[in-house]
Structures are given as structure tokens and as C-alpha cells.
Amino acid sequence: MDLHQQRVVVLGGTSGIGFATAKAAACRGAEVTVVSSRPASVDRALADLPPGTHGQAADLTDTDEVHRLFQDLGSIDHLVFTAGEPLALMSLDTLDLEKARDFFTLRYFGALSAVHAAIPYLRPGGSITLTTGIAAQRPGPGWAVAASICGAVESLTRALAVELAPIRVNAVAPGVVRSPLWDSMTQASREQLYRDTAAAIPAGRVGEVDDIAQAYLYCLTQPFATGSILTVDGGAVLA
């Protein structure tokens, strides 16, 4: 499937994996709109994205604002949801339940709200691609909240693929990727995470956002894929 003149909306498309996906789709001829809650982030992203890329600011945790966003955008072909604040590992003995609920607000309910709002505007043959992570398959200590979110998104993906057919619904499950996702960690801790991960997995390195963007393009363009969780982790689930 060619993306030429296809309308692609990337929620969370101003940084990290979302930005790389938006750029890759635009380079394949798509008409891309990136969305972030921060207008300044939208402006910075547009300065670095191919000409013809559009941007809008919207609070993806505000249901009414999300519905207005899609009303303004009109008909689209593909929805990509990569939005998410930097993760914080939380062991059970230090668990902050309010913070845990906050993580679900954007990463799970934000995705569900976006799909609900976008459905009336998705053209026939369109697709939805959500974002999960390998924590659902192989969690480590401190990953109870993150693993739960990833598991919820994977279940949501499969349920939506059935309910919304023939609209295709898939999700990408990255492993550890060098991206702003880890900005809540100190630089030393972050670099140690990258080194430890690279040493432990078959690929021998951590992922880059451009690696993961190719997985999203696959989900956008593969007409026979739906209900799939595409794991792109350098073999981390095998390590």
C-alpha cells in the first residue's frame, strides 16, 4: 500500500518514536499532521519535518478537546498513537497510586479516547496503530504499572480489531529505545540502562527511533495485518 496523499495523524508526533514515524510517513508521500499538548513542541517539530507537514496542539487527556481535534482535521486515513510522558519505574514498596493512575490517563485512556473520536473520520481501508511495549511480555522489577498499561493496550488493540473491522488496528511493542521516554532518569542511569540492555540482548545494541518508525510504517501499509502486536526489541524477549 502506497502512502502517497494518504492523511496520517500522529498523536505524540513531535518527539521520539512519534516524530520519527511522522517523518518516515511524510517521506513516503503521506500528508502528515503531528499533535502534541504543547504548542512549542509542535513548532519545533514542524521546523524539522518535511515541508507540507501540519501540526496542532491538543490536550489528549481532555475528551472534548480530542473530539474537537478530529472535527477540525476531517477525514483521515491512518491514526498513530505514540503519546506518553516519560516513564518512571515504581517498586511496590514506593508505589504512588495517584501517579500510577496518571500514567494510565494518557497512555491507555488517551488512546481509547483518540480512537473513539477518530472513528467517524477514518476512511475505508484506514488503520489505527497504538503503542505498547515489551514490558507486557517480560516485565522486570519496578515495572508493575508500565507492564499493566502495556497489557491493557495490547488487549484493547485486539478487541478494537474485531469491533472496528474492516478498519485495521495494530500495535507496536518497542524494547528499550534511545528516546526522550527515559528523560525522567538521570543521564548516568539512562546511559547505564542503554549499556546493560545492549549487553544483554541478541542485537547487541539498544533501538533507535528510526528503527521503530519502520514498524509503524509496516502497520500502516500492510493491508492484511490487523489485531497484531509487532514486537521490535532487538530480541529482548529472548534474552
Residue locations for each model-derived region?
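Rossmann-fold cofactor-recognition segment
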Residues: L49-D64
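Conserved glycine-rich cofactor-binding loop
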Residues: R7, T14-S15
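Hydrophobic positions on the long internal alpha-helix
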Residues: V80, G110-A118, L156-T157, A215
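Conserved mid-core segment of classical short-chain dehydrogenase/reductases
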Residues: G84-R101, D183
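Catalytic loop of short-chain dehydrogenase/reductase
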Residues: A100-F104, Y108, S113, S127-A165, ...
